[in-house]
Amino acid sequence: MLLDRLKADLAELDTRALRRTRRSLATPCAPHARVDGRDMLAFCSNDYLGLAANPALTRALQTGAVHWGAGCGASHLVSGHYAVHDELEARLAAFVDCERALYFSTGYMANTGTIPALVGRGDAIFADRLNHASLVDGALLSRAELHRYAHGDPAALERALAASSARRKLIVTDAVFSMDGDVAPLATLLELAERFDAWLMVDDAHGFGVLGPGGRGAVAEAGLASWRLIYVGTLGKAAGVSGAFVAGHADVVEWLMQKARTYIFTTGAPPALAETLLASLELIERGDERREHLVGLVALLRRELTLARWQLLPSRTPIQPVLIGDNAEALAVARALWDEGLWVPAIRPPTVPHGTARLRISLTAAHCADDVRRLAQALNRLEAQR
């Protein structure tokens, strides 16, 4: 029976230490949280600037709800597009120095809608092997040829581009890779896009608000500008709210508005969220002190960790992965940390390649130095004991 097979598949997940579970928070997003009835110090959140519970954002959300109501009532192309959505898109485009931006309800929807709108059968996509699942799914939905090149290897990408006779080419990459914390070689990728007449789509989910001048992201940090660039920024991470946007040349964004199915065939995001995001953008622009504090915490963690067998992967971003390897051991270490009041997620396949299970430490500007030292001391001790 189908249900028996499903139960067997679930049991197999347990056997391989791959079943995922949820934990329930009873407090707002912050490092010190009440989780499943316990007081915990959390290193899980991608609220990198500590804005999710910022009073200015909660006030903006309240004001927006009073003015605009709870929902928008329709899709953007029917009657669900409000003046505050226009204002947000204009502000986002200006912030990342692009001609125009389009606001999506989620980052997943932005990626899975944008890629199939740009390429299809007869076209080719060239994707870093460690791209986020939403980029992979968008590529598969497009039905274009999918070439996955070795992670961070522009030479492999160049060979694939040179061998392709596709009518349209799209290079797709994370800016900051979510499970490793490293940054893509964006300048080299843009040079290849120009040489081989390709689009370059950059998903800056973990760079927007954190990297670059004024938090304008990894593309701004690299000093890049081109009509070929299609920039995706996430608004539920450093921005502390929800949603995502795609920015670029005005004609590209117009095309996405006409063709991106995840934009067209869904009710628009509540205008109160757009109101909140306008307040978030102001805090991001003025957030140099937060970003400097975050850089200091990253440096402190890397100094304090003295691991011998486990590997702290090279990363200058708030994502600091500790590679353990074995699924069961990674889970056991995460449980041991949990027992000490430290919440650090164990990341396992299929999110990461087999044999690379890890702890994914996420630092935020809301952490303090003592928080980081406490975590480092616990990890050093646990590794020595195992």
Swiss-Prot record:
Gene3D superfamilies tied to this protein: Aspartate Aminotransferase, domain 1, Type I PLP-dependent aspartate aminotransferase-like (Major domain)
Gene name of the record: bioF
Similarity comment: Belongs to the class-II pyridoxal-phosphate-dependent aminotransferase family. BioF subfamily.
Naturally occurring in which organism (per UniProt): Aromatoleum aromaticum (strain DSM 19018 / LMG 30748 / EbN1)
Keyword entries, A-Z: Biotin biosynthesis, Pyridoxal phosphate, Transferase
Binding site for pyridoxal 5'-phosphate: 107-108, 178, 206, 234
Binding site for substrate: 20, 132, 351
Protein name as it appears in the record: 8-amino-7-oxononanoate synthase
Superkingdom field: Bacteria
Keyword set includes Kinase: no
